[in-house]
Amino acid sequence: MNLFHRTVTALIACSAALVIQPQTLVPLPEGAFFEPFRPHLSVPNQERILREGDRLAVCGDSITEQKMYSRIIETYLTVCVPDLRVSVRQFGWSGERAPGFLSRMTNDVLRFRPTIATTCYGMNDHRYQPFTAEIGDVYSQSSRAIIQAFKSHGVRVVQGSAGTVGKMPSWVQTAKGNVQDLNLGLLELRNIDVQLAREENVYFADVFLPMLIQGHTALQKYGASYMITGKDGVHPDWAGQLVMAYSFLNAFGLEGNLGQITIDLDNKSASTTGGHEVQGYNDGRLTLSSRQYPFCATGALGDDSSIRSGMEWVPFMEELNRLTLKIKNPSADRYRVYWGAFEKVYSSEALSQGVNLAADFPENPFSEAFRKVDQAVATKQAYETRQIKQIFHGPEGRADKEMAAALTEKTREPLVRAIRDDFQPVVHSIRIVSE
C-alpha cells in the first residue's frame, strides 16, 4: 500500500472514529421537552479564579444593561467576599451582538485596564431565527477575537453563554420559527462557547442550561405566569437574573463559606471564623461584629420578580451563601434561636450539625445594611451606562475621548466611594433558648 492509500485509509478510519465517538453531552432530564437538545460537556472550573484586587468588567447586551445580574454579582463580591477587594464595572449595551462589542471594546472597556471579564452575548447574535452555519461562524469568529483581544491585554476571560427565550419576541420583526427553534439555535451558540473556552484556555459560565432546565421545572410548578426568562420571553426579572448571577459566581470558583459561629452551651463560650468577631457573651446573649455579610434576599418563591425565588432553582445558598451557626453540648431536644429581632426553632441535632442562617432568615440583622450597599451599587452601575452610552458615544466623546473619560471618572469616583462608605461592620446578637 503506497503513502496515498495509507493516508486515505487513515482519514477514513479517523472519520469513522469521530462518528462512533460523538461529542460528550451533558445529561438532561428525561422527557419530550429536552429530547432535541444536545448540550456539549464543558470543562468545569476547579479553582478560584478571582484574585485580590481584581478589576472585573461585566460585558453583554440588553440583558446585561438591565443591571440586575451584574448588580447581584457586584453586591455579592462587595459584602460576601470583601477581602478580595474586587472592583466592578458593567458595560451592557442594548441590542448588541458580539461583533458590535468587538468594535468598541478598546475604547469602552480596555482603557479601564480590567484584569478579568465576563461576556454574555448570543441572544441578539442568534437573530431570533433558526440556527444557520453563517450565524454560528459570525458569532464564533467575533467571540474568539474578543477573547484574544482580552488575553492580549492580560485579561482573564469567563465566556458566558446566552440564556433561553420563553416566547417569540414581539418587537423583533424578523423573528422566524418557534420558541424551540430559537432555543436550539441558542444551544448551538452555547456549544460554540464551550468549544471556544476549551480552545482558548479560558473559563466558561453556563447560563443556558440552568435557564432551560429550571425554566421548564418552574413552568410545571407555578404555571405559565411564572417566566424565568422574563415576561417578554427574553429579559429575565430578578429570579432569572439570580440564576444568571449564580452561573458567573460559580464559574469564579468561589467557595461560599461566609463564616461559622460556634456556641458551646455548656461552657458558655463562643468562637467564630471568617469576618466575624465576638464582642461579648453575657446572660446567654452572644454579641458579634461582622465585616462580612451574607447575601440577603427576600420575596415569594412563586414570584419571578423575586431574587429569593431564583434561589429555588440553583444551589446559591448551599454553594455561595453559607453563614453557619453551630452549637456544642446541647441539653434539650429543641431550641429557639433569636437572631436580633428574628427567631426560628431548630432541633438540637440540626444545630449540632450546623444551620445556615443566611438561608433560614430572609430578613435578618444584616438586611438594612445590605440594602444600603446594594442601592449604592445600583446607583453606580446606572451611571456606568450613562458614562459609556451617552457620554463616550455622545458629542463629548466624539469631540475628545480622553477628556470625556477623565471627566466622567471624576463623577464616578464618589459613587464608588459611596459603596465603600455604606459597607460598614454590622453589630448583631444571637440568643439560644431551650424549648
Question: Residue spans of the language-model regions?
Answer:
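Bacterial N-terminal signal peptides that target proteins for export
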Residues: 1-11
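Hydrophobic h-region of N-terminal signal peptides that target proteins for export
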Residues: 12-21
